[in-house]
Each structure stands twice: as C-alpha cells, then as structure tokens.
Amino acid sequence: MIQMQSTLDVACNSGARRVQCIKVLGGSHRRYAGIGDIIKVSVKEAIPRAKAKKGDVYNAVVVRTKKGVRRPDGSVIRFDRNAAVLLNNNLQPIGTRIFGPVTRELRSEQFMKIVSLAPEVL
C-alpha cells in the first residue's frame, strides 16, 4: 500500500536509487496504490552520471510492496521493501534491466516488457 510521501526503492537501472511518491494516479481522491498501479514519483537519491537525476519527476509502476498481494487461491505474496520501476511518458520502462522478483499481477498488456526483463516472476 503506497500513498503520498511513501519512499520506494528503484528496481531498474535508470540511475535513481530512492524515489518518493508524490501522487497516486487513477482517480481524483485515490489514496493508495498497490502492485501494478501507476504513481507519480520524485527522485530523492540517484547515482552520478545517470539518466535519472535528483529532483526529476517520473511516472512509476509499483512492482513490490510490504503489504503484498492476495491471490484468488488465498495465498499472499509479500516483500521486505517497497519497490517501483520508472516509466517514461509512454509508460515504457526507462531502464534496460530489472532487479529482483516481480509478481504475476504485472502480466497485463501494459507491463509485459517489465515481466520479460525481470529475473524472476512470482
């Protein structure tokens, strides 16, 4: 469950290390975002000479949450940290690599690129 002011790790090689959620997209009063939801983020920490700089604002898709996701069979998949992948204006990933596992819930038409780049799909 990600809300405004939540900080997330970045799970791609765009150059950003930590981002902060500044808006949950998808409705005028939407409060929380879960896995597969798009949020607006500000880069808080970045590596030198990278594409993403500190202070830049991007769209991002949430790929891992501490809250986790409940499957229809009753199982729950949770993670230790919240993580997101930075997206460009066309909602395509900025980075060319994805770090760490992602969930099967991202297998929509929109995020198949992220699923195919991920080392593990849970």
UniProtKB/Swiss-Prot annotation:
GO terms for biological process: translation. Keywords: Ribonucleoprotein, Ribosomal protein, RNA-binding, rRNA-binding. CDD domains: Ribosomal_uL14 (cd00337). The keyword Ribosomal protein applies. InterPro entries: Ribosomal_uL14, Ribosomal_uL14_bac-type, Ribosomal_uL14_CS, Ribosomal_uL14_sf. Pfam families: Ribosomal_L14. Gene3D superfamilies: Ribosomal protein L14 (2.40.150.20). The keyword Ribosomal protein applies. GO terms for cellular component: cytosolic large ribosomal subunit. GO terms for molecular function: large ribosomal subunit rRNA binding; structural constituent of ribosome. PANTHER family: 50S/60S RIBOSOMAL PROTEIN L14/L23 (PTHR11761), LARGE RIBOSOMAL SUBUNIT PROTEIN UL14M (PTHR11761:SF3). Part of the 50S ribosomal subunit. Forms a cluster with proteins L3 and L19. In the 70S ribosome, L14 and L19 interact and together make contacts with the 16S rRNA in bridges B5 and B8. Binds to 23S rRNA. Forms part of two intersubunit bridges in the 70S ribosome. Belongs to the universal ribosomal protein uL14 family. This is Large ribosomal subunit protein uL14. The lineage of its organism: Bacteria, Pseudomonadati, Pseudomonadota, Gammaproteobacteria, Alteromonadales. The gene is rplN.
